[in-house]
Amino acid sequence: MGLRLLACLFHLPTAVIYGSLSLFVSILHNVFLLYYVDTFVSVYKIDKLSFWIGETVFLIWNSLNDPLFGWLSDRVFLSTQQPGAEISSPEVVLKRLRALSHNGPLFAISFLAFWVAWAHPGLQFLLCLCMYDSFLTMVDLHHNALLADLAVSAKDRTSLNFYCSFFSAIGSLSVFMSYAVWNKEDFFSFRIFCIVLAFCSIVGFTLSTQLLRQRFETDGKAKWDQESTLKELYIEKLSVPQEKRITLVEYLQQLSRHRNFLWFVCMNLIQVFHCHFNSNFFPLFLEHLLSDKISVSTGSFLLGISYIAPHLNNLYFLSLCRRWGVYAVVRGLFFLKLALSVVMLLAGPDQVYLLCIFIASNRVFTEGTCKLLNLVVTDLVDEDLVLNRRKQAASALLFGMVALVTKPGQTFAPLIGTWLLCVYTGYDIFQRNPLSNVVSAQPKLESDTILEPTLRQGCFYLLVFVPITCALLQLLSWTQFSLHGKRLQMVKAQRQGLMQGRAPEIKMI
């Protein structure tokens, strides 16, 4: 039985195994996003100064580690070479799989460090965030880079992304299961739950990467034997020019001239900000806009569905991408976000059912857009390769440079959101505890009753004006992005030509 199961796993399509890696990230990361702030604020009682110091250091490290790890991984690919040099090979894929097989289990172990008090809350908060983000960055960089390395055509990349969304949706079920064990007064059951999740993630990373490595090691060995003979003939007959090594400064200069990259990161910075704004303030909106109008189970359902629906919705968006292209779908989602926000603003905060739909759909469509943008980055990888005639696509490095510019949006979201709320209403999350009862209606103190109308109005304005502003700025940036239509087809054709460019040289020899 065990051998038959292993045989079935070995014959799974590459896209399925690649997509399954998203499952082993999402089962942990969704739980982390939902509970880490509440754990340190409500359970470990971190003070306000330590919290902001930790977030500030995390902002810096979170922005720098993506390009740093990307540069360390892909700097050897930046050298230029004569036309006809091979662009993609099993060795590149194997390098990324080895990185995933090492960093995946370490990522799962770092996840466990949050749920046991082992140091001063401020120190533990800082160390846990930086350690967790480091391993998550390594996993994300190489997993995303494989999307560009395993396929070139939009159809194949869409298929890979489809399975990522499918498995991410399954991984989001961990959020629903966590409700059964989450108890700030008794952490034992939640800790056991997290240990089980981490163990599943470790086993999954190990098994999936091993299956993919076996598959590409077989292909790589055959290809290596063939290339060794061809290189000997090539060296005997022709002199090969020395490769030109690209320094970091030269690479940054190349990126600064990459017009589509610049417009994309401007748009994506706003998108990352909006995604994390929704995640950070979703519980607050539920508490102060809906808690006295909906039941606890309804609030929990809205919170849970907001985590799983983006992945399921993305399966439909990907089918639209196959038909209309990623650019058109993303532009349509920006217009949809703007239209829904304007309708909600005109309707006002007293339309309960419309408010429920808007709060949930705002997060679902925003997260869905984020998940499509990896396809755009892979197109930028192709354009970067063609424009700069690289011998190999520096996929992880370009994903890292995108993150360098856009990841500050993760930290700006809670900072700007809490600042706007405090300026408008005088509400301070460190003096009150809005997360102590996210979706339930408890008896309010007299001071709370006085503050509630202003706080409710402030939450509503944040809810509608942030997406309106984001949508307008994103549409402005996205209209300047030209890597779609005929230009994208031309870039794809040139990269395919480079990949097949060795064949004419062999015939000449």
From Swiss-Prot:
Residue ranges crossing the lipid bilayer per the database entry: 11-42, 55-73, 99-116, 125-149, 154-177, 190-221, 260-287, 301-320, 326-345, 354-388, 398-424, 459-477
Topology Cytoplasmic: residue spans: 43-54, 117-124, 178-189, 288-300, 346-353, 425-458
Cell compartments where the protein resides: Cell membrane
Residue ranges that the UniProt entry lists as topological domain Extracellular: 1-10, 74-98, 150-153, 222-259, 321-325, 389-397, 478-509
Main location: membrane
Gene3D superfamilies with a match to the protein in the record: MFS general substrate transporter like domains
Claim: Cell membrane is one of the keywords in the record: yes
Membrane protein topology class: Multi-pass membrane protein
GO cellular component, one term: plasma membrane
CDD domains linked to this entry: MFS_MFSD13A (cd17481)
InterPro entries listed in its UniProt record: MFS_trans_sf, TMEM180
Keywords: Cell membrane, Membrane, Transmembrane, Transmembrane helix
Protein name (database record): Transmembrane protein 180
Organism, as annotated: Gallus gallus
